[in-house]
Amino acid sequence: MNPIEMSPDELSHILETKTPVLILDIRAKQSYMDGHILGSANAICQSMQQKQIIMSKLPPSMKIVLVDDDGTSAKENAMMMARFGFDAHYLKDGIKSWKKELVKSTQDTTISGDNLWDSLKQNKDVFLLDVREPEEYSEFKIPGAVNIPLSQLFIPGSQSQIPKDKKVITICSHGNRSMVATFALAQNRIESTSLVGGMAMWNQVLNATTLKEGEITIIQVEKIGKGCLSHIIGSNGEALVIDPTYPASKYVEFAQKEGLKIIGVIDTHQHADHVSAAKDLAQFTGTKLYLSKLEEYKIQNQQIGEGNIIPFGSKQLKVIHTPGHTAGSMSFVLDDKFVFSGDTLFVEGIGRPDLRDQAEEFATKLYDTLHNKILKFSDDVKIFPTHHGEGVKPTQNGIYYTTVKMAKTLPLLDLNQNEFVSKVVSITTPRPMNYSMIIKINKGTIPVSPMQIPDLEMGPNRCSIRM
């Protein structure tokens, strides 16, 4: 008998005696969900690279049994794994040889970021299990997720805090460790679902919330994983988009849902924490791209600055130059009731002035911008920023904004100029991941593939400071 071949009786004995074993079902997802061996996990790799990553995360000394339809593919993969030193086997003649009862899945084996967000919005009973290392988890995470590193999940007793009456979602950075986590949980008869693409793809989920203000429609688009905020501003069927993020096509979808046609796209400044979708959205919709004339771009655009007007529908946006976060930062005023402030002023803090290595000079400009421009508006003016920080809650209507009156209560804005500059430049916050490359991409000096964006944007946004 082939030493890596395992009969159904042998596998049945292993299960009955509760001998540690990983049973990996490599059939198509639907076949697995329709009926599988109790304690097995679905193991589908999309490429040889992913297969190698998955194997590197498996416990090397544990017995592994591969299951397919007829034993053919499972045998090939078991032989390959054995060559890498694994105690790998395959079920002879595959699942068709298994005479005992098969169990059906009660939940999908994988879930997309969009579908997970829908579940969380609907308050569905889910348990988020983050299997990254503690230092990764502490950097950024989905709120409410519990951290048990994958390296611990195979240790007896490590799964005691995982509820068996909730839908368990496993999470990692790219969806590989989370898949292996489903293997570990299946050993203990815990069904689980792996987040496809992990935190990298979670950072690409967009959620739209609409605010109606008379003739004006404001659609705030939140990049859930990073707290980036974009705005679609509509009037009489026409819309402008401010600070769009990827995926760009979602903005057309959000606008159309409210009966709006995008006629212009704007970036408030050169972003450092996320890749701007402004150029691609403008090209996709065949509209103008508006960028600051005080910042260097290698992108064809309509340059704008202080005092310029951008019409849409029956309304118009007025440009004000609001330097400090960057030299060319702009804010946009609508009807003297709404200000779209970019990274100048946030609900919880202000834009950081140090990302261009001129912190003291930019902090001085930021003080002037805040006190002599933004805070000069009426107290009831609503200010819509381009980010919100961790732990910041939206208003009752689900929109993130502040008012001039509320902004005046921020501790940093209660300081005089010298105190402000001294305090701001002394606050040390880690810079956004990949910020230098992202700035170059947003300038248009280096190209980027859409496939690269999730990895470039990994991590929290770090463009604000607060006391």
What spans do the regions from the language model cover?
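Active-site metal-binding motif and surrounding structural segment of the metallo-beta-lactamase
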Residues: 163-169, 248-290
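Short glycine-enriched, charge-decorated loop/helix-capping segments at active-site entrances
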Residues: 38-43, 143-144, 353-360, 406
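Rhodanese-like catalytic fold shared by cysteine-dependent sulfurtransferases
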Residues: 1-22, 28-127, 133-167, 173-240, ...
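Histidine-centered divalent metal-coordination motifs
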Residues: 141, 266-274, 325, 329, ...
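Catalytic core of the metallo-beta-lactamase
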Residues: 209-262, 299-388
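Generic beta-sheet signal
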Residues: 91, 195, 290-293, 342, ...
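Accessory terminal helices/loops
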Residues: 183-188, 208-210, 368-382, 386-467
